[in-house]
Design a protein with these regions (language model features):
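Bacterial N-terminal signal peptides that target proteins for export
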Residues: 2-16
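Bacterial N-terminal signal peptides
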Residues: 13-26
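Sec/Tat signal peptide C-region and signal peptidase I cleavage site
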Residues: 26-32
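Short, glycine-/small- and polar/acidic-enriched structural segments
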Residues: 33-173, 178, 189-195, 218
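Sec/Tat-exported extracytoplasmic proteins
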Residues: 64, 90, 95-98, 105-108, ...
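Pocket-lining segment of extracytoplasmic ligand-binding domains
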Residues: 178-274
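Secondary-structure end/capping motifs
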Residues: 232-322
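Conserved C-terminal helix/tail region of periplasmic/extracytoplasmic solute-binding proteins
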Residues: 309-362
Length: 362
């Protein structure tokens, strides 16, 4: 079965990614121009399966045709590789989390725009221990997780809640493919992982779910991120993507046969079935309506979250090569608020195109 939440792997090819980031700086001027053909990438995850449906059902083509452009939709099974390719100029947009948007394209110098805020994890990620105990009891223990992933971030937030630091325990880097088997061994005491692995581990006898992404709602965000220069030179590209997305949201969220068929398609395409996909939707806060995503984008909470995220990335040395402080990368928000060095603004949270969708102006 395919990994349902492959979005979270931070692969060992990070050095290659850093090279591509440096290369991107030379590619962008050539990219930024009026054009008629675009490419976007997506990878398997509950909140990104709508792109597969929108492509297969001709919804993306319908909206691209409306604006006289072409949009190619490409599935990339290696999530981090899809971001590396986006950063290097192979794609005009791709799906990614807020954390990865800041650390990879933005941290590497590519001016990027979060065009669509699709959802946030609301229980899809969790910390499980064997037996009784609380977060404070993790002190001195090993915790298995995919290092430098959102699982690592979730652990940091869990430790914050108990006034602990990573220095007081040991992080054991473990691949997602090995996580369930590792948990079943006698020497593994705690793991942090994501669904469907999380559900499988939490169902083991004696397993206790201590902390989940539902405890930090709105912090692990899933988005469609596009090249800012390409978007500025080709606003119809943004309009077509947003139009296709919210048409798909309307279909999949409906409590009718068409909605059920859409969710079934998305489940099967991601390697599960309707029940499995809907179980994952239950722990995902989807923004089916553009107004919901806009309110989230304009809230103070988003800026506060990104402040926490940038400090986590800086502390772990992945905010950008040679970043001197958490302020290294500048960010802008729809509220008008900013974070970081505005002379180096590389991540922009945008609500204008979602606003057009909300107003029926696409």
């Amino acid at each position: 079965m395919l990994r349902i939440l492959s979005r979270k792997l931070l692969s060992s090819r990070l050095l290659l990614g850093l090279f591509l980031l440096a290369l991107a700086a030379t590619l962008q001027p050539a990219q930024a121009a009026k054009k008629e053909s675009f490419r976007i990438a997506w990878s398997i995850y509950v909140g990104w399966m709508p792109w597969a449906y929108a492509d297969e059902m001709g919804i993306v083509k319908k909206w691209a045709d409306k604006y006289g452009i072409e949009i190619e939709v490409v599935q990339i099974n290696d999530y981090i590789e899809s971001i590396n390719q986006f950063t290097a100029g192979a794609f005009d947009g791709t799906v990614m989390t807020n954390m990865d948007a800041l650390s990879i394209p933005a941290g590497g110098g590519l001016d990027s725009t979060a065009l669509i805020i699709g959802d946030f994890s609301n229980g899809n990620d969790g910390l499980v221990v064997k037996g009784e105990g609380d977060i404070a009891a993790l002190k001195g223990k090993n915790v298995n997780l995919v290092e430098l992933s959102v699982s690592h971030y979730l652990l940091a937030r869990a430790l914050d809640s108990a006034k602990l630091t990573e220095r007081e325990l040991t992080v054991v880097n473990t691949s997602d493919a090995d996580m369930v088997a590792a948990y079943k061994t006698a020497d593994v005491e705690a793991v942090v992982t994501w669904n469907p692995l999380l559900s499988e581990i939490a169902a083991e006898p004696g397993a206790k779910l201590l902390y989940t992404s539902a405890d930090i709602p709105g912090e692990i965000i899933d988005m469609m991120v596009v090249n800012t220069e390409v978007l500025n030179d080709n606003p119809d590209f943004g309009k077509a993507l947003v139009g296709a997305w919210y048409e798909t949201m309307a279909v999949m969220s409906a409590d009718d046969e068409a909605g059920k068929a859409a969710r079934t398609f998305m489940g099967e395409k991601s390697g599960t079935d309707l029940a499995g996909y809907e179980a994952q939707l239950a722990t995902t806060r989807m923004f089916y309506e553009p107004a919901e995503a806009i309110a989230f984008a304009k809230s103070e909470d988003l800026m506060k979250t990104m402040d926490v995220v940038r400090r986590f990335l800086f502390d772990h040395g992945i905010l950008g090569e040679g970043a001197p402080s958490p302020d290294y990368v500048g960010m802008t928000f729809p509220s008008g608020a900013t974070l970081g060095d505005q002379a180096n603004t590389k991540l922009r949270f945008d609500a204008d195109f979602m606003g057009m969708a909300a107003e029926g102006a696409l």
